[in-house]
Amino acid sequence: MKFYIEDLLVYFPYSYIYPEQYSYMVALKRSLDNGGPCILEMPSGTGKTVSLLSLISSYQVKNPSIKLIYCSRTVPEIEQATEEARRVLQYRNSEMGEESPKTLCMSMSSRRNLCIQPRVSEERDGKVVDALCRELTSSWNRESPTSEKCKFFENFESNGKEILLEGVYSLEDLKEYGLKHQMCPYFLSRHMLNFANIVIFSYQYLLDPKIASLISSSFPSNSIVVFDEAHNIDNVCINALSINIDNKLLDTSSKNIAKINKQIEDIKKVDEKRLKDEYQRLVNGLARSGSTRADETTSDPVLPNDVIQEAVPGNIRKAEHFISLLRRVVDYLKSRLKSQMLLSESPLAFLQGLYHATQISSRTLRFCSSRLSSLLRTLRINDVNQFSGISLIADFATLVGTYNNGFLIIIEPYYQRQNNTYDQIFQFCCLDASIGMKPIFDKYRSVVITSGTLSPLDIYTKMLNFRPTVVERLTMSLNRNCICPCILTRGSDQISISTKFDVRSDTAVVRNYGALLVEVSAIVPDGIICFFTSYSYMEQIVSVWNEMGLLNNILTNKLIFVETSDPAESALALQNYKKACDSGRGAVLLSVARGKVSEGIDFDNQYGRCVILYGIPYINTESKVLRARLEFLRDRYQIRENEFLTFDAMRTASQCVGRVIRGKSDYGIMIFADKRYNRLDKRNKLPQWILQFCQPQHLNLSTDMAISLSKTFLREMGQPFSREEQLGKSLWSLEHVEKQSTSKPPQQQNSAINSTITTSTTTTTTTSTISETHLT
């Protein structure tokens, strides 16, 4: 359908639209008109992605110079967004005909997901793929007449830069195009990003400085940036600027230094001019000159605004001097890790200690990362991953030399499970997520932060330190209540249930938790997903259930599958869980909050008719890094410790229960099995689209009350439900859309405005005449 939102004609590729989709697009349009950042929460499974793409692609028709940069978390989400973009653009083009603008939508991923070179693509490890690719595509390898080359890359270098693509290219499309034209999909994608109207890739290509400066630094400032599924965006920013160092890494770094030193000595004997040329480039401030796109590995780990645009200091221009400096840094870090005490200090205090011991200044440290990259290129090293140890040390040196505020260094014992010993770990921690977001907010005209679970919205604006132009928290419009939340506070024996540390192992609590699953598995059809607070607690409670005979009772109703920390095992368990649901046998999947199942996998329709959340998934508060971050948030942004911990736990809980609702025709039971969920300060941090169903009869339930409520709910959901019943309330046709005040064509809006002005003028004239008569 086509409809107006104010002065914008929107092309929406479906015949019907949800009211919340329309409201979402109105808020998004208002944000784009105003510019600046916005934060939008929309119910899970109500078509957020297609709403975004429809509105923004229509906005691009009116503003053709604007680029859309769409960021998501995982490869499946990138592929899903690309297919939605294909659907939106096909509809727009069919409606506009010859007037439709030529549009390129380009997705992007790693070499591992795009490589088509037979020998390289059969490797599963991404680091190995990267190394083999660089071996075949580096400029020095290609100069050698005897070395093996990649024909796909050679064809791209010869013809790829002249190609003008049009249409939508998913990762699979790129690989097919590459095979058909014998051209490298990875480098083609990287090249075409600069010309694409719509770019779809992962967060790291924009938020991780080491990658962003190579991939997205040339994007125009009038672009629209969308962070979809952005409920964990603060953690992405923090992880991109944090580094952990242990003794094993330092030993690897020492070996790396020795190996590099030997290669320098070898080159001096056969090709000393190469080192002299590099020295001259560094003197002239041209560290990257002479390198090609294929030679570049990663860039500086610091944000673009903080990169020093000047020549490398004289004391590290010579390769041997630089290696000597790295050796001193590594030795100093080794000495710091010898202490068995827990230590925390600011970067400034660390730099003072380093300078006192080694005479290395912070200014010199800032150049370590770029200097090492230059040296590895000069030495013509393809497999840079074998030097990952010293590369991480160089990244740390650059970061600690650049940043002070919002960072902390923590040295603490770390338990090594495989050796059953404690080893010291040196952690350079970013505490302030706003540092990573600031360059994005500063550069781009519009930044959209959106997800189904962003509540409470105000805490994101504090943590990321921005003032949104638009804030919207949408509810779900429904003709029937397809969500049944149950706040379970006690078992059928009226004993309170909770995973609080002091009661979580209580026999009565564990028994009640098991009895709940037995009863739920007897009445709920198809699939049930259970989330525990940790792997250790899941193992503990399942073991006790087995001793009590509860697992056998569950198995009479459904099969049981378990998520583990091993990705391959979990993938197999998930595959068999879905098979059991498809066959009608039904299944229970035992998984962990903050695990893979809780974040990236949807359980629509028969795969998720009920989700049980055992306890509140609080993060481990014993972590010294977390304690430091909590203190920072309290002092800097006035976010209280308990406020953040509850917020973090409830967004994780929302993600878990949101897995089972993937559309309005879907339905599911959400059981929050912990008495603490009944407290208002916890419950109010759930998304609005869940809260709207938390009526008094859903609160403070015992197991038998929850089972009774669930039976009634499932009977209601089993009744026939047609599209006609939804029309007008939870589903709109074009007729319903056009009745909205914001959906009048511009001519009608202008007529209404002119009519108002005319009426106002007439009234003013009449009033003026009366006043003059009165004065006379």
Curated annotation (Swiss-Prot):
Keywords, ordered alphabetically: 4Fe-4S, ATP-binding, DNA damage, DNA repair, DNA-binding, Helicase, Hydrolase, Iron, Iron-sulfur, Isomerase, Magnesium, Metal-binding, Nucleotide-binding, Nucleus, Transcription, Transcription regulation
Coiled coil residues, start to end: none
Cofactor note: Binds 1 [4Fe-4S] cluster.
Low complexity: bias regions: 755-776
EC number(s) reported in the record: 5.6.2.3
Keyword Amino-acid biosynthesis: no
Binding site for [4Fe-4S] cluster: C115, C133, C150, C184
CDD domains: SF2_C_XPD (cd18788)
GO biological process: DNA damage response; nucleotide-excision repair; positive regulation of mitotic recombination; transcription by RNA polymerase II
Record-annotated Helicase ATP-binding domain positions: 7-277
Reactions listed under catalytic activity: Couples ATP hydrolysis with the unwinding of duplex DNA at the replication fork by translocating in the 5'-3' direction. This creates two antiparallel DNA single strands (ssDNA). The leading ssDNA polymer is the template for DNA polymerase III holoenzyme which synthesizes a continuous strand; ATP + H2O = ADP + phosphate + H(+)
GO molecular function: 4 iron, 4 sulfur cluster binding; 5'-3' DNA helicase activity; ATP binding; ATP hydrolysis activity; damaged DNA binding; DNA helicase activity; metal ion binding
Subunit annotation: Component of the 7-subunit TFIIH core complex composed of XPB/repB, XPD/repD, gtf2h1, gtf2h2, gtf2h3, gtf2h4 and gtf2h5, which is active in NER. The core complex associates with the 3-subunit CDK-activating kinase (CAK) module composed of cycH/cyclin H, cdk7 and mnat1 to form the 10-subunit holoenzyme (holo-TFIIH) active in transcription.
Similarity field: Belongs to the helicase family. RAD3/XPD subfamily.
Name of the protein described by the UniProt record: General transcription and DNA repair factor IIH helicase subunit XPD
Phylogenetic placement of the source organism: Eukaryota, Amoebozoa, Evosea, Eumycetozoa, Dictyostelia
